[in-house]
C-alpha cells in the first residue's frame, strides 16, 4: 500500500486529493495546523475513528513554519509521496502579512525538501510542490507555458517563486523526484469563501433567496483561467506517477473576465445581469428573470423579491476600491499542452459545469440559512 503525506489537507485541494488517493487504495496522512481544529468540514466525510487499527486516513498536527515538526512527521510517516499543498494562498491578504507568507509558503517548501534529504528518503519519496499561475503576474506572453518568464506581483507570488526554484534546485542538485505543478485558478463548491468565484456564487445565492441586497467586487475586468479543483488534483497525482520529475502547467487554456463569471453564474439560476458604467462607477443590475429556471433551481417562494428588485432597478453588483490589489494581475491564461501530451491529462469540467456545480451547492447551503431565519433563528453575517 502506497503512503502519501498531504500538507494542507483541510483545504480545497487537500480534501479532494485525500478522497481521490483513498479511493486508489493509499494510506493517507494529512498535516493540519492547530488553528484548523474547527476547520475540518471539507474532510469530515472521510473521518475515521482514531481508535481503529486499520484506518487509512491519519491526521497530524503540523505547520510549515516548524522545521522540527516537519522532519519528525516525515520520519514517522515515511511517505512514498508528499503533496505540499499548504499555503497562505490569498493574494490580497499576502500584502498585509508578507513576512508570514514568505516563511510559510517559501521557506516551508525548503523545510520539506531538506527533511527528505536529511532523512535519506531521496530514493523513496516523491514530492509535488503546488506552484501557482500568480508566478506569471505581469505576463510576458500569452498564453503562459512552462517556459514563460515569471514576473510575480504580490508577496504570495514572490514566496511561491522561491518555492518553485528551490524545488527545481533540489531536483537538480540531489536528484530528487520533485516536481512543480503550476496550477491556474481552480474552483469548486468547497473553495475558500473569500476567493472571488466563491464570493460571487455565495452572494448571488443570497440575493436570489432574498437574504442580501447587493455585493461588492474589485477589478471586474481581471481575466482568469478557471477550472474545477476535482480535475486539477488528478493532474497532481499524475505528475508524481511519471518516471522523470518535471514541471507542468495545469490549465484549461480559456480565460474569462470576472464580470463575465458573474453573468454566467446569475444565468445558471435564471437571472440576467447587465453592467453599466465604467471603473469604480460600474454597477450590475438584474434586468430579467427566467421564471422556469429560477423556480426550478431556487424556488417559487423567492421569485417575488427578485421581480421587485427588477422593477426598482436596484443595483446588485458594485465596485469597491478596497478590493483592488496594490499591483494587479490583469490576464492569466495557461497553455496546458505539456500536461496534456505527457500526462494525458484533460479536464472533465468546462466553465459552465463548474459554475453549475458551485451555484447548486451554494443555493442549497443558503436555503438552510433562509429556513433558520424564517424560523426566528440568528444566522451568521456573511458580509465582507
Annotate each language-model stretch with its function.
Residues 216-218, 249-251, 318-320:
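Solvent-exposed beta-strand sheet faces enriched in polar/charged residues
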Residues 37, 226, 255, 318, ...:
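Short aromatic/basic micro-patch
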Residues 278-282, 289, 295, 310, ...:
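Flexible, low-complexity inter-domain linkers and amphipathic docking helices that mediate domain-domain
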Residues 1-188, 230, 236, 240, ...:
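N-terminal Rossmann-like NAD(P)+-binding domain of SDR-like oxidoreductases, especially those catalyzing
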Residues 3, 214, 245-247:
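Residue-level preference for the first positions of well-ordered beta-strands
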Residues 232, 236, 250, 261, ...:
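Non-catalytic, hydrophobic alpha-helical segments
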Residues 43, 229, 288-344, 364-365:
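Conserved C-terminal active-site "lid" loop/helix of NAD(P)H-dependent oxidoreductases
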Residues 42, 139-143, 153-155, 161, ...:
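NAD(P)-dependent short-chain dehydrogenase/reductase
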